[in-house]
Amino acid sequence: MTEQLNTNQQNDEAQFMIQRIYIKDLSYETPNTPAVFQQQWEPELKLDLNTTTTQLDKNVYEVVLTVTTTVMNQKTTAFLVEVKQAGIFTIQGAAASQLDHLLHSFCPSILFPYAREAITSQVIRGSFPQLVLAPINFDALYMQQLEEKQKATGAKDETVSH
């Protein structure tokens, strides 16, 4: 009887599985070479992140993390690298709020190290100094996004009610 209860408890939990991780798109540009190689190296990094999700089938989702890095050196673009790191994930038995968190925080945190490696590799191949992106707290970004949505919804509600 104990075994049956444990089995039922396990079935109530969300199940998560990585099916595949892959690069969907990769772009590398060095618009100001070779002049940028002659300058004193004083890089300024701009990092942009975006996540998109697509439901492919029942309980199967594609999550694409787009990471765009632009490095400026003395007010000129040294290089720009954009990678769309994707993954296909199976998620079963998750409540709506849990599913949203998995798709917009947990999955991107799985994809980011792969994107970071792809960016670092392209930068080195371009003969620039190694670029190591710091880890990103996707949970904090997700919570910030939820708060912004709640504030926007609250503002709409206030506008409608007045």
UniProtKB/Swiss-Prot annotation:
GO BP term (any one): protein tetramerization
Task: From the Swiss-Prot or TrEMBL record, state where the protein is found.
Answer: Cytoplasm
Superkingdom field: Bacteria
Which is one Gene Ontology cellular component term of this protein? cytoplasm
User: InterPro entries recorded for this chain?
Assistant: SecB, SecB-like_sf
* Keyword match ATP-binding: no
User: What one GO molecular function would you report for this record?
Assistant: unfolded protein binding
Alphabetical UniProt keywords = Chaperone, Cytoplasm, Protein transport, Translocation, Transport
Could you say which protein family the record assigns here? Belongs to the SecB family.
Record PANTHER family: PROTEIN-EXPORT PROTEIN SECB, PTHR36918
Assembly, per entry: Homotetramer, a dimer of dimers. One homotetramer interacts with 1 SecA dimer.
Functional note = One of the proteins required for the normal export of preproteins out of the cell cytoplasm. It is a molecular chaperone that binds to a subset of precursor proteins, maintaining them in a translocation-competent state. It also specifically binds to its receptor SecA.
Q: What is this protein called?
A: Protein-export protein SecB
Q: What is the lineage of its organism?
A: Bacteria, Pseudomonadati, Pseudomonadota, Gammaproteobacteria, Legionellales
Q: Which gene encodes it?
A: secB
